[in-house]
Amino acid sequence: MGESKVTGQYDASQIQVLEGLEPVRKSPGMYIGSTGSSGLHHLVYEIVDNSVDEALAGYCKRIMVTINEDDSITVEDDGRGMPVDINDDYNLSGVEIIHTKLNAGGKFGGGGYKVSGGLHGVGASVVNALSERMIVEIKRNGSLYRQEYSHGVSKSPLEIVGKAVGTGSKTTFWPDPGIFEDTHYDYDTLQHRLREMAFLNKGLRITLGDDRNGDRKKEVFHYEGGLMEFVKYLNRNKDALHEDVIHFDVSRKDNMEVEVAMQYTDSYSELVLSYANNINTIEGGTHLAGFRAAVTRVVNDYARKNKLLKDSDPALSGDDVREGLTGIVSVKLERPQFESQTKIKLGTSEVRGFVESATTDNFTAYLEEHPKEAKDIIDKCMQASRAREAARKARELTRRKNALDSTSLPGKLADCSERDPALSEIFLVEGDSAGGSAKQGRDRLRQAVLPLRGKILNVEKARADRILSSEEIKNMITAFGCGVGKDFDISKLRYHKIIIMTDADVDGAHIRTLLLTFFFRHMTPLVEGGYVYAAKPPLFMTKQGKDVYYTYSEPEQDKLLAKLQENGGRQKIDIQRYKGLGEMDFHQLWETTMDYNNRTLIQISVDDASQADEIFTILMGDKVPPRKRFIEENARYAEVDI
């Protein structure tokens, strides 16, 4: 985070209004994405982003976020404080305009802010519109100002309620339960985002507190190392190829800046995150394209120049040179152009050349100054290249075999007769025994079954060539029909529901995790598109007289037993606890786990790539201490049958 401050005043005259606030309550999803959990947490980010923009402008050093006892949120900063003077055009204070007019803010003209993630005031007004109550307090001019709102409308004028030392803004809001499905905030979700913001803005101190349930906890996120510390944090459960993090920060006269931190590990997967003005550009864009192009060219040029790659050797591909790379690419610029309203892909064309040039110069300099580390990096890239070539040959062999064999689907697959993928689903079933029951009990029109023998390969510890030689993985790839890795084509997917059906025990959970690791690492669009599900088979079957009940957890079973004993008197109760799917006959399996009307399916989703990468690295990687720590910390959330 640069130390330079934006010149120019920040008062009500700089607040410009684009349109009124009425549409927000009618169509909240257009402004915050959804009225579910992600939208609820988005409210916090909108207010925090305004404070971060004060930090980017050089005026804010501390931000405090508190989840209050009643699940309201307070965000406080030590920035300049929102403008309290009257705007002549609207005869309202700057504070009230910011909170009651949509698209009102001080970021259009460039005087109040040079670089910002959003439009100052868009966030505040949207949050106000979607809150049943909001209180704003401002420290400015030696006075403490206060104003209260409800559902986007001011309930009191802006008034001075006392004296104040210093400057800053404080916002407390209560999300409207009439709009949101649930108004309970998740500490871990906020923790992840605020830690990320602190990494991206070195020196900024962000505090997160939780005052609920009498359990007053507080965490401080403050990283003087910025992106370098971010990369070390992401790699803390991996083994780095070189101890130091490669880092550079380059600026241009027009306020465009790129900062990059990168480090290679012994992992087989890439984790490169990109940001534009602190916004996580999940789909990348011109900054990420420039970075990737430069890394590929620099590694190839260095390898050729130093005879590590022979003239006759093919060039290393982008995938080869990024295997095991953890990187952060963060750009800051005026008026960024995004390719969608949700700002997940940067479209500003001139950024590509700037990032590519900066990366080429600085990464080349690092390799030339660190020949030992350079050789280790290029050795890893060349191993990746050899594995990729072996995997390509394995895929070609499979393709040729499939082209010659009209019955190329796996022999174990019991396919469905429906040919519309949107109406079709496939069950991946643990073991031949349960697979047999599933084949008998299924709806043959729409449900396919593929039994899996034992535990599939742990892809976290294997390269592509070994993965593609695994029989169980080859069977899945062939059955799905959409290819894998670079050949993946979602339009060719044969089933729009891929359902993992494993035993409700430790082994079943392990197999489920192995499958999810494979899908996340090598068929990512399946998970991102919401095509992957986990079936939830029952844990208990309870009989009382002629009545049969199935329950799916111990608390549910306890409730059922209490109810039966209350209503059924002395009538005998028989309980069977299922250890595996194979203990159910095909009628029971259909009735409890496969029947469209009765079953419970859990849709697997990935909200955050770095968090998912971390969990799979911990659970399926080589390091035991972080895995043990993760299991101990999360055991209370798990349902485990030992």
Residue ranges of model-derived segments:
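Conserved short strand/loop->alpha-helix "switch" segment adjacent to the catalytic nucleotide/phosphoryl-transfer site
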Residues: K26-Y45
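C-terminal interaction appendages of subunits in large macromolecular complexes
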Residues: R386-D405, D420-E425, G436, Q440-R442, ...
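GHKL-family ATPase ATP-binding module
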Residues: M1-Q14, L21, L43-Y45, D53-A55, ...
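Residues immediately C-terminal
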Residues: D53-E54, G81-M82, V506-D507
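Short conserved segment of the HATPase_c
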Residues: M82-A104
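Helical (often loop-to-helix) elements that flank the catalytic cores of nucleotide-handling enzymes
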Residues: D88, E339-R352, Y550-E556, L560
